[in-house]
Amino acid sequence: MRFKNVLVLLLLLVFSVINSEPSAPATISDNIYTTLYSSYPCTKIMTSDGQFGCSSKHGGNSGILYLIDDDESYNNYFSYSQQKDIIVVLDTNYFNSTSVLNLHNKSKIEGIIVLTDTKKTYPYSPDSRYPNKIYGLYPNSNLEWNPNADGFTYFSFPFPIFAIDNQTSVAIRNVSKHNRDGQYPAWGAELDSFMQGAINSETCLRRGFCEPVGGQSIWSSFSSKIDKEKEIILVMLPFDTTAFFRDLSIGADQSSFATVTLLSVIKSLAAVDRSSWNKEVVFAFWNAERWGYVGSEYFINDLLNFQCKTYNSDKSKCIDPPRADLAFQTQINFTKISTIIELNQIGRAQLDKNLGKYSLYLHTAGTKTSSVTDILDQVASSYENSTITFKPTTQTELPPSSSMSFLKKTNKIPVVVITDHDYKYSNPYYGYEQDDNENVLGSTLNDIVYILSTFIDRIAGGNNNITIDKNFINILYPCFTSSITCFNILMKTYPLNEVPNFYSSVFGTSLTTTLSPYETKLIHRLLYSITQYNSTLTNCTSDNDCPSSLCYSGQCVSSNTHLHNALSLGFDFDTSKNVWKIVNSSYPIFTESNWDYTALKVFKIGNSTTEIWFLVSGLIELLVSIGLILYVKKFLSNRYKLL
């Protein structure tokens, strides 16, 4: 009986020890922290002479939540006596350079969470007042195209800044108010977005902690092969966007509206008889244009200067220097480009109350532009019940645009840049997260598509009756400005983030290993599908089954659609050291820092009395446990001689 009692006691001790141990470290972490998955960090960008953006400390920054949602809470912050580290929660109206720099300079903060459950009540852009000024045609210009800008994007902060989605913002606002009311337990947050890059682009690249900002541009033609002897009409746009939080770069007016427009124009023209066209029409979507027009610059440089030293067996690719596609060299003659039409910001056409129509503006450069704009005016005026009219700009300089890259090489090409502004941007949120579907006029889209489709058909030599594909437009428009969950037939994968994001990202780990975001791949496949000239009877399940073509609806399809590197000419890849290097710092030198992962977690914080009570109770429990163990040990030793 005694032995049985001893055995039971030992089993109870073992059982208590086992149950006192955590099953896994993650269990404790999960019980303490709540991870917020819909969070979007500010990242760090390196330049040739410094850096801008944000980063947390290694392991993250944490602190108690402090809500600033009105002037009183903003002013009270500077007399806030809380001794603990602070994570500031900002209503979107207080997210600007003046407020944040004031907080940063006058107090120590561990990080910032920006709420998105409300809209800014004033126009705001964190970009510069003349985007890309030093890389354009007029580096000494005194114009300010973007008057609502404060340059906030280009400041550097030693703490993390996160935005969170609408639903999460409501929850964080509530628990932050809980803190402000002095209730316990209080709430804190941990922001982890450690960026490995430091100093500048040269140092960061040498250490292998950065990659060049860039991507891949896309160009396409209806012709199976462009006749190099024919004149070329180049219809183009910059399709990448920017925002303070890169994962929220919708850029509805900045680019997305124009991208939808041009894709819809191409869709309309795909259905017409093009046999009467006496000119080639090339459609181009330039990437990484917001970083010094590097997409268009790289393409032009390849057209004019590229020389392949070593080809592959069929001369379709170049091994040295590496180019995966040489169609640009075999099909496009730079001197044959006779007209450039660029769609820029066109999503906020201005209402002319006298005409009862919305106005878009024509910015021209080069020679003989009137012959082009006259045709556009004729098309627009002949379209009955049109809501759109076109006006000449009052400015002598072009707005920031990809056309500048071409005009640097020659001023003999007629260039027409179409925008929704005469001078100052009509876009109140350029480069900001609120440049979304609510910031553009979707009601003008059909008329713009019809007029531009007819216009391009006319200048190419056609005289077709245009019918726009409204169903295509109705699918594409919300997809590119609201939720990019469309066209699942074209894309086998699903976007990780449903918010459309046209940030160009980084180019890749080498010249032959490029990275293409979901949105770039989608535009490429859309273009490929629309401009296809041949569908074989070859069955396929993936692109791997289709050499030199792509797989659509179970069949291999051919198209004259191509990807082209969008990378600053200031970079080259050192194959001997397997690192990027800077070869010419006069070009844009933007690199993005590497990071392991990003996370935003919230947790509860007790008051000092509660914390002391937990400490004391823990010590009491420890002492009681030690006393119990010593007693049991002595009891077993004396009575049963077991210990």
Curated annotation (Swiss-Prot):
GO cellular component, one term: gamma-secretase complex
Record localization: Membrane
Family annotation (Pfam families): Ncstrn_small, Nicastrin
Superkingdom to which the source organism belongs: Eukaryota
Keywords of this entry: Disulfide bond, Glycoprotein, Membrane, Notch signaling pathway, Signal, Transmembrane, Transmembrane helix
Biological processes annotated in GO: autophagy; macropinocytosis; Notch signaling pathway; phagocytosis; protein processing; sorocarp spore cell differentiation
Subunit structure: Component of the gamma-secretase complex, a complex composed of a presenilin homodimer, nicastrin, aph1 and pen2.
Organism of provenance: Dictyostelium purpureum
Record protein name field: Nicastrin
Disulfide bonds: 42-54, 204-210, 308-318, 479-486, 540-551, 546-556
Parts of the chain on the Cytoplasmic side: 633-643
Family: Belongs to the nicastrin family.
Gene name in the database record: ncstn
Secretion signal span: 1-20
Entry membrane topology: Single-pass type I membrane protein
Transmembrane segments: 612-632
Biological function: Essential subunit of the gamma-secretase complex, an endoprotease complex that catalyzes the intramembrane cleavage of integral membrane proteins such as Notch receptors and APP (amyloid-beta precursor protein).
Coiled-coil portions: none
Glycosylation sites: 96, 166, 333, 385, 584
Extracellular compartment spans: 21-611
